[in-house]
Regions:
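Charge-dense, helix-prone N-terminal extensions
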Residues: 1-118
Length: 118
């Protein structure tokens, strides 16, 4: 069984597995990792950062039609995105509570939406 997503390293590895156009960037400081598209002018597909010591948060773009679904499914662990457009972005709090499949679905969706430039 695959370990739960709880680290920036795990998120980076998964994001980079989605396509060879994804790279890590640290636009603010070493805490804020941006996963960016090379071929889309550096558009961000996800921000990953420690918000509290030992607590990794990940901002992802989501389809607006599914926003409420995710907020209701994980009301304590998925929130309107920190420092982002709350209509289009969600924050996942990665403490092992969110199923791996759901973390991967949200990251894949963000990859597709940001690759298209939506």
């Amino acid at each position: 069984m695959k370990p739960k997503y709880t680290t920036k390293k795990q998120i980076s590895a998964f994001c980079q597995s989605l396509g060879n156009d994804i790279f890590e960037d640290y636009p603010f400081d070493e805490n804020w990792m941006a996963m960016r598209h090379m071929d889309k002018g550096g558009h961000v597909m996800a921000f990953c950062y420690e918000y509290y010591i030992g607590e990794v948060w990940v901002n992802v773009k989501c389809e607006t039609d599914y926003r409420e679904y995710w907020l209701k499914k994980y009301p304590e662990k998925i929130k309107p995105a920190y420092h982002m457009n709350k209509r289009h972005w969600l924050t996942m709090i990665l403490d092992g509570s969110i199923a791996n499949e759901d973390v991967e679905t949200l990251l894949k969706t963000s990859y597709v939406l940001t690759k298209k430039g939506i």
